[in-house]
Amino acid sequence: MKTLHVDLGDRSYPIFIGAGLLANPEKFLPYLAAKQVLVVTNTTIDALYGDSFFSLFEGMDKAHKVVLPDGESYKNLEALNQIFDALLEGKHNRKTTLVALGGGVVGDMTGFAAAAYQRGVGFIQVPTTLLSQVDSSVGGKTGVNHPLGKNMIGAFHQPNVVVIDTDVLKTLPDRELSAGMAEVIKYGLIADYEFFCWLESNVKALMARDVDALEYAIERSCQIKADVVAQDETESGIRAILNLGHTFGHAIESDQGYGNWLHGEAVGAGMVMACELSCRMGWIDKPFCERAVALIAAAGLPIAPPESMSPEDFMKYMAVDKKVLDGGLRLVLPNKPGSSIVTDSFDADALAATLGRTGQLG
């Protein structure tokens, strides 16, 4: 088992990574505020792991479970209210702890419920998809979607602990594995060229679910994110680089309907667009852009946005992106291999060509 730490002063917490952790009560019980717990999961994960995991909390004064519908389309206020209903009906107080057993949707909604319930209670992240293990479970971003924008309603609320059981990836659908790889590749593009090169050499092993390769990819991804979050917890500065591909990607998700494109699929296409824009402006050379696109494709991800989306469609959603500052669009773009920046200094014609899929790269 590997242990990492997110260093945030009195809000610091560990990340445990290893096999068989779902069955280890010592990774959960010490992080409860009292003997009361609400486990939040979804229909898919509940059928696989719900009963055995819930048995860890036998003997609690209060132990309840709420099972949400599975899918991004249910990451909304209506589903969030199901969590609040369970808390109130079970008479949970400020000493309760919520436990998110599921992917990013479950984790984001559970964390937001924990941030809001009685103005803040503790929660534990138990991510069950590759994407949530390497990204959404770490860093304290929580929230729900709105028909007009993704993750526009939420809060920063750090978990008590993140428990990553690599065994759960054995039951992860192939499409979800590819979606998670988008966020793994992102870390190589924004912060670690050596890791990017390692991914190029090991992408086949990762897609074949090689245990050692997956554990290293998860560990390195979490370490990069933990380091960034420690510098900028509330995304007022450097943390925004974690959104590489997300401005384009969120536009795709919003336009296509939440869940029709998985988040990682949209981010994959969005990273291709970000690389192409940087290449058009001469920030990265064409060979590196082609390597990035090839790696994204090798992970089974789309490398182009939906043909139905026009530049106007993109701009409609990008105009309400959370990185917009004083009415100006800001993008996260690669500026050299293994490095990205947040900038509003991009060429408008190059952006138009990227959105319209016109013209040649560098």
Curated annotation (Swiss-Prot):
It comes from the Bacteria. It comes from Saccharophagus degradans (strain 2-40 / ATCC 43961 / DSM 17024). It catalyses: 7-phospho-2-dehydro-3-deoxy-D-arabino-heptonate = 3-dehydroquinate + phosphate. The lineage of its organism: Bacteria, Pseudomonadati, Pseudomonadota, Gammaproteobacteria, Cellvibrionales. Belongs to the sugar phosphate cyclases superfamily. Dehydroquinate synthase family. One of its GO terms (cellular component) is cytoplasm. Catalyzes the conversion of 3-deoxy-D-arabino-heptulosonate 7-phosphate (DAHP) to dehydroquinate (DHQ). This is 3-dehydroquinate synthase. Its cofactor is Co(2+); Zn(2+); NAD(+). Pfam families: DHQ_synthase, DHQS_C.
